[in-house]
From Swiss-Prot:
GO terms for molecular function: GTP binding; GTPase activity; translation initiation factor activity. The keyword Glycosyltransferase does not apply. Residues 481-485 are annotated as: G2. This is Translation initiation factor IF-2. SUPFAM superfamilies: Initiation factor IF2/eIF5b, domain 3, P-loop containing nucleoside triphosphate hydrolases, Translation proteins. Residues 456-463 are annotated as: G1. GTP binds at residues 456-463, 502-506, 556-559. It comes from Helicobacter pylori (strain Shi470). The keyword Lipid metabolism does not apply. Residues 502-505 are annotated as: G3.
Amino acid sequence: MSEMVDLKKFLTELGKTQKELKNVIEQAKDIGLELKTNSKMTPEQAGKLYKYIVDGIKEQIQANKPTKNPEQDNKDDLNITATPKPLNKKVSKTPKKEETKSQPKPKKTKEKKKEAPALIAKKKGGIEIVNTFEDQTLENTPKVVSHSQIEKAKQKLQEIQKSREALSKLTQSNTNNANSTNNANNVNNAKKEISEVKKQEQEIKRHENIKRRTGFRVIKRNDETENETENSVAESKKPTQSAAAIFEDIKKEWQEKDKQEAKKAKKPSKPKATPTAKNNKSHKIDFSDARDFKGNDIYDDETDEILLFDLHEQDNLNKEEEEKEIRQNINDRVRVQRKNPWMNESGIKRQSKKKRAFRNDNSQKVIQSAISIPEEVRVYEFAQKANLNLADVIKTLFNLGLMVTKNDFLDKDSIEILAEEFHLEISVQNTLEEFEVEEVLEGVKKERPPVVTIMGHVDHGKTSLLDKIRDKRVAHTEAGGITQHIGAYMVEKNDKWVSFIDTPGHEAFSQMRNRGAQVTDIAVIVIAADDGVKQQTIEALEHAKAANVPVIFAMNKMDKPNVNPDKLKAECAELGYNPVDWGGEYEFIPVSAKTGDGIDNLLETILIQADIMELKAIEEGSARAVVLEGSVEKGRGAVATVIVQSGTLSVGDSFFAETAFGKVRTMTDDQGKSIQSLKPSMVALITGLSEVPPAGSVLIGVENDSIARLQAQKRATYLRQKALSKSTKVSFDELSEMVANKELKNIPVVIKADTQGSLEAIKNSLLELNNEEVAIQVIHSGVGGITENDLSLVSSSEHAVILGFNIRPTGNVKNKAKEYNVSIKTYTVIYALIEEMRSLLLGLMSPIIEEEHTGQAEVRETFNIPKVGTIAGCVVSDGVIARGIKARLIRDGVVIHTGEILSLKRFKDDVKEVSKGYECGIMLDNYNEIKVGDVFETYKEIHKKRTL
């Protein structure tokens, strides 16, 4: 035998509480099952009760099946019966006792049959529960029926058939209307109703497969509906009416309902506030979310239907917690908005409060240990990259003697200091805003010519060697035989091309030499065999080492007598460059630029090294080139010598280089021939630039002129901001001290040169002459001729000068210079320019004063002469004592007085000087406190010029 089902467990399965126990017991009575609070059921009884409560399917339990009342068969077929319990589920809000009293007994109905129709006791707003389904729509809502309704319609048909036999008993007050015709009409109407009910039954079967229920619809049983049921019982006692009369009554009822609904619309009732409304007045919780309630299933206070949600089947247990969080956030937001903005002010302590908050923010920051920053970075950008507080960075620099603002740029030294102070690992990257060249990934890299840079000390024969390679004379065109500009040439050897870059060798052009090393593949260091390694030679080796390029040594001037190549090799070996014949890895090729010996061997060595390196580049795509030199040429405007690194540069291509932009108009090779395109490692002179680009800048080919112009403008804005930021680099203490002592003397200069590379070299050389007392202030520099605007810039200064290199002023400029009293000096050799500016600075500097000791005398006796003063009788112990010379009076090793010897006598005669071992009389100017034992020390002041 199966186990019994406890009623409490049954409630738990239904998702109901103990408060709903009475309703479940009453529903059990509807199917003939008597239950109590602690009762148990068989599984069969529990299943039927579950179907009745959940699905509305009523199956009577045979043991408790109630008997049918025969008196109810006499009721009218179009009215609703009152005595049998309705087949729809009902749950009364009144207690059980009150409900049982309101139900009439069959006996009382039988006794009052011939009297006035007995009314059922008035109920207090019962409710009717109807299942709702997920796919119900607005049209399907009123069609919800159950199997019990179909049984009810069949009972009506049986009652109508029985009413024919009891026709005479029901026609006491209105016999004319109780004829068989009306009964026949009623029968037809009942058949129609049965057919409609069958359609509804099919609709129910369609919904039987839907297991999920969204809730119960509770239909309010108000007084009007109770009156309708009572009236239906009373009317069941009356004789049957005609169909026209019935329709007339229905029409009146609907009109009354419409009037009542109109009154309710004018005076809408306010629903009572739920407990959650106290905590959440502005937030509406939508219980119907994700529950597929459609049509009239949503609760409307104006209707007589209420929807009870079935929440126990949904997995929304955390719904309430989410709603509480939302409600709390809304309350917090409202609380912040209502906050008084002055409630936390504390008078003069407001600033300290902000400082405390500032320190708290700083404590929350996590300092990064390894960062990557661009080469040129501002102070605030460095703080952001390193996740540091800006105030701490500025404070650290201030403690180190640097007065900076957040927009100032940091140099490499400052970055290294900050990295050490904050324990950071910093990698500096050159991330200036440049256009990335679109490389064709599927393109094939092709072999390209090697780029060779000729480097070395001044006058060691670099240009002459390259001239011999090209079989042309170039060095004689350079002033003083010194290369002033970078020269780039293409040389063919064994059907292979080699690109040569000739860099100036003297110290002033170290920047240009460094720039040449950045674009080269192989460095050839030229060293004169009769001169050996010099300072510029060491610098050239350092540049090549920094560029990580292989080095080949060319020992030039081997045609001279008494040369010692082994000595040169030994000097290079001391620097770490061991020759191959000494067991090292560096080639030392003996050459002669005068006779041409060894040049073929040098070229073959270069080509072998290039084959080992396997130099390749992609020829497709936009060009990327390096500007070796820029200048202004008459009739052509701004021109630039470029060497292509990747891609192809053609005539008509748009480009930009730093602040310059334009479109390639013409291209000329080193022999003066016009060409249409440049491939990797090729060199040419291009025209069509908006201005002279700085030497060493990267030229990028772009799609059109608008992109080129935009990128150049961005770069110009960046450089302008960087130049303005340099004004705050001097500390206030240093500046105020120099101004107070009038020690700082400036020489404003305007520098004009024919090429950009020469201009940079001159500027760097002049800035190296600056010191603490005098300084050269470059107020303007540019490429091109001297203009009247240049004169106006320096006209207001006393020592202003305009320096021109390889340019000459016009007649109008010379006349204006005389009016403004401005000196214009032009040069063709950079050495002459630097030496003359050095002399000018030395003239403004105060000379160095040195003392020369001349003699010494000891005081043996003193003589006081009235109206004259004290005369000291002395013996010259060292040197010569002269009249009018400066002397110090020393007593016990301490200088008592410093002055001039006013009178010098030998006995009674005045003398000019007294030699060692002789006696003399000495009188000082305006000083008489001389004692026996004092010492006179005489000296001369010698003024010497400063050196730079």
